[in-house]
Amino acid sequence: MGALGDSAYGARGRLIKFSYIVTALISILFSISCICYGIWLLARRSQYAELVSPSLYVDVGRILVIISILSILNYLICFYAIFKEMRCFVTSCAVASIVIAVMLIIGGCIGLNFRDQLTHYTPLNLKMLTSLRELYGTHDMKGITESWDALQSNFKCCGVNGTDNAQIWKTSKWYMHQRAPKLLIPESCCIPSEIERCRSNPFDQDAPPPYYTSTCYEPLQNDLLHVMNVASWLCITNAIVQIIPSVAGCWYSKLIRK
């Protein structure tokens, strides 16, 4: 009875096996949520990467997706190994879970570091101002042009911040290199229902502005800070969730007699 109690078939072994399965399933569900959020981040926020370079937040999104997929595959292999009582594979999968947890923690730290850099050190407003004036609309910087158009359309904003509002477009190379009749602001600044008036005379003082009057710096910064906060803590929490089944897996592998 003592030998049986210390084996995978005893009460302790069955409890550890059950604990592993439950915690692994919880971890899989959490990994699926990480994958969904990472895909959303890459699909809906990666278009602004050209304005924020280095775009570490995109890397965090990739880490969320790729490492979470590896985590799920690892659990599936471990499920098979546990039910077949393949001791070596169970141990390997448990160790792999720890490695995956470390990679997720690294991803979370990258995200938190990005937030700190964006808040205190990265002159995002100056980067945006430079890209608007010098790079928007140039043939070899289509990524910048697309990023600005997506930003202004999606956030319903125009210009950078403060005095560098919609009027700043008249100082840009995009404006200077146009042929007459010139557009004063890009169409991405225009309210869709006012597109014609926005093209012809957007700065008419006798009518409400046909363009977005909010500037883009603060909305973009606040959005990226929020998105990265969620992504970073998803990474770290997923890493913590990985630890419990990895410990249970290592313990269970010691009870397998094969």
UniProtKB/Swiss-Prot annotation:
Membrane topology: Multi-pass membrane protein
Phenotype of null mutants: Embryonic lethal. Mutants display dumpy and blistered cuticle phenotypes. Blisters contain unidentified cellular material. Resistant to iodide toxicity. RNAi-mediated knockdown results in the lethality of more than 95% of progeny at the larval stage. Most larval arrest occurs at the L4 larval stage and is characterized by body swelling and abnormal epidermal morphology, which includes blistering of the cuticle. The few animals that develop into adults have a distended body shape and/or epidermal blistering.
Effect listed in the UniProt record for changing G249R: In mac33; blistered cuticle phenotype with blisters containing cellular material. Resistant to iodide toxicity
Any single GO CC term annotated in Swiss-Prot or TrEMBL for this entry: oxidoreductase complex
GO biological process, one term: skin epidermis development
Membrane-spanning residues: 21-41, 63-83, 94-114, 224-244
One Pfam match: Tetraspanin
Protein localization: Membrane
Xref: SUPFAM superfamilies: Tetraspanin (SSF48652)
Coiled-coil residues: none
Major place of residence: membrane
The keyword Cell inner membrane is annotated on this UniProt entry: no
Tissue expr: Expressed in the body wall (hyp7 hypodermal syncitium), pharynx and vulva. Expressed in a punctate pattern along the thick region of the hypodermis.
Cytoplasmic-side positions: 1-20, 84-93, 245-258
CDD domains, A to Z: uroplakin_I_like_LEL
Documented effect of changing G111R: In mac499; resistance to iodide toxicity
Keywords: Membrane, Transmembrane, Transmembrane helix
Domain of life: Eukaryota
Intervals, Extracellular compartment: 42-62, 115-223
Family of the protein in this entry: Belongs to the tetraspanin (TM4SF) family.
Role description: Plays a role in cuticle biogenesis. In complex with doxa-1 and the dual oxidase bli-3, promotes the generation of reactive oxygen species (ROS) and tyrosine cross-linking of collagen, thus stabilizing cuticular extracellular matrix.
Subunit composition and interactions: Interacts with doxa-1 and bli-3.
Protein name: Tetraspanin-15
Annotated organism of origin: Caenorhabditis elegans
Gene name per UniProt: tsp-15
